[in-house]
């Protein structure tokens, strides 16, 4: 099911570095441009089939125990870091650059690019077909819904979705209604226990013979 090193391109000394055992699926591409790019994959990372991770320039870091699905693409020209123990679902695109297109008289491909780093915190879950664009910061413990486009800051412990992705709720917020239902249930349980104790006490008193 997994190969340790499949289609692993070393375009320069230590261009691709694995700090421990790494699981690579079929058709995985890891490429770093000689003298410009570097990929660092920490131990116990799982990368699924047909993923393409390319450091054209700059660096890509994938933290320990992160799991990636299949058909994902990461393109870096500056710096992309993914924290430890993240869940990266299928068909995700992540990049740290955009093409300039301000001059209509010059072909877009000739106008150069603009770059900003991407930061994905630890314990983040990216749903299927999420796009993470340049300059994005996704805080630790956040969940991004399927088909969302992330551009900018997502606070830690957020549940976010949409185009562009916006916070729907915080994982730290306890639903007030759930708290009220639980409090009511506990109150009912206390009253029930009290009533049963009274019934048991009365029954015991009635069954005790009068010795006077």
Sequence positions of predicted segments:
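Terminal amphipathic alpha-helical/low-complexity segments used for targeting or macromolecular assembly
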Residues: 1-14, 19-20, 85, 91-92, ...
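Short hydrophobic beta-strand segments in globular cytosolic domains
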Residues: 127, 133, 145, 150-151
């Amino acid at each position: 099911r997994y190969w340790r090193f499949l289609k692993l391109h070393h375009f320069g000394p230590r261009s691709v570095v694995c700090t421990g055992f790494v699981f690579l699926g079929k058709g995985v591409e890891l490429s770093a441009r000689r003298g410009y790019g570097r990929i660092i994959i920490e131990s116990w990372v799982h990368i699924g089939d047909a993923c393409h991770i390319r450091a054209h320039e700059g660096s890509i870091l994938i933290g320990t125990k992160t799991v990636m699905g299949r058909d994902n693409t990461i393109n870096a020209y500056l710096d992309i870091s993914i924290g430890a123990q993240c869940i990266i679902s299928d068909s995700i695109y992540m990049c740290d650059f955009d093409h300039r297109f301000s001059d209509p008289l010059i072909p877009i491909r000739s106008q150069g690019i603009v770059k900003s780093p991407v930061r994905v915190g630890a314990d983040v879950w990216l749903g299927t077909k999420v796009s993470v664009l340049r300059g994005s910061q996704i805080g630790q413990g956040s969940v991004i819904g399927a088909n969302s486009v992330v551009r900018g800051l997502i606070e830690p412990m957020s549940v976010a979705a949409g185009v562009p992705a916006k916070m729907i709720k915080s994982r730290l917020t306890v639903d007030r209604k759930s708290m009220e239902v639980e409090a009511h249930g506990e109150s009912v349980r206390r009253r029930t226990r009290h009533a049963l104790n009274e019934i048991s006490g009365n029954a015991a008193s009635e069954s005790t013979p009068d010795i006077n």
